[in-house]
From Swiss-Prot:
The chain crosses the membrane at residues 8-28, 35-55, 84-104, 107-127, 132-152, 162-182, 208-228, 229-249, 263-283. It is found in: Cell inner membrane. It is an enzyme of class 2 (transferase). Keywords: Cell inner membrane, Cell membrane, Heme biosynthesis, Membrane, Transferase, Transmembrane, Transmembrane helix. It comes from the Bacteria. This is Protoheme IX farnesyltransferase. It is a multi-pass membrane protein. Coiled coil: none annotated. The gene is cyoE. Carbon 2 of the heme B porphyrin ring is defined according to the Fischer nomenclature. It holds the Pfam family UbiA. It comes from Serratia proteamaculans (strain 568). Its main location: membrane.
Amino acid sequence: MIKQYLQVTKPGIIFGNLISVVGGFLLASKGSIDYPLFLATLVGVSLVVASGCVFNNYIDRDIDKKMERTKNRVLVKGLIAPSVSLVYATALGIAGFALLYIGANPLAMWLAVMGFVVYVGVYSLYMKRHSVYGTLIGSLSGAAPPVIGYCAVTNEFDAGALILLAIFSLWQMPHSYAIAIFRFKDYQAANIPVLPVVKGISVAKNHITVYIVAFMIATLMLTLGGYAGYKYLIVAAAVSVWWLGMALRGYKTENDSVWARKLFVFSIVAITSLSVMMSIDFSATAAPEALMTYVW
């Protein structure tokens, strides 16, 4: 029973989000870590993400049964009653928001609320099922965790927070489109209007390339803005160029599914690498003037 309640929270997604939370938190901490704040932020975000995932499982149970990769989910198989899952999701969310408000700051909590509302209320309930732009809207919620981690420390939404929002939002797009390509038949069977299904895989490849270029530019802004150091810059440039190269090879591939799966796997490597590097190669003297120095 415990295993089922854990599975419905999507532990893999929680873990992936926590890596980005740590990146944002340590970037803002600049080597001076408030451990009680750190713990409250990690647990608070974990609870909110878990809540969102349970709500998503509840909302998607009708389409999950049509998809090969989701047909064995807990709610689809009836291992947890839908009404119970709603109570569970609500309890997780309330606990998470309360912990962020009390243990971090109101800004961190409100950022979590906004990410939650976008994911559950806008993306899961409507956009995912009705619009090709669902992925774009969903990317905003996916970018919330590192921003929450950052703002838990700074207690303000500054240029650094905005850059993190841009990096992680832009990353979500090729990452998600790659999944939609190698899971094309699943999305088609469930009638989910993702870009590769609606516009075609060739169009999706163009979008993937453009978003990776934009992602590359956004990642460099952390150093140009004085928030991260040159070691981070080198890694960011390297993974971005490699990821772009993989995307470009997609135009010549004979097997879109294999190519997309490789692109997806590397997307995880890329964002994890950036999260680690911003955690350890922060700039101790980040200032708005730094960006102007590079520009001029």
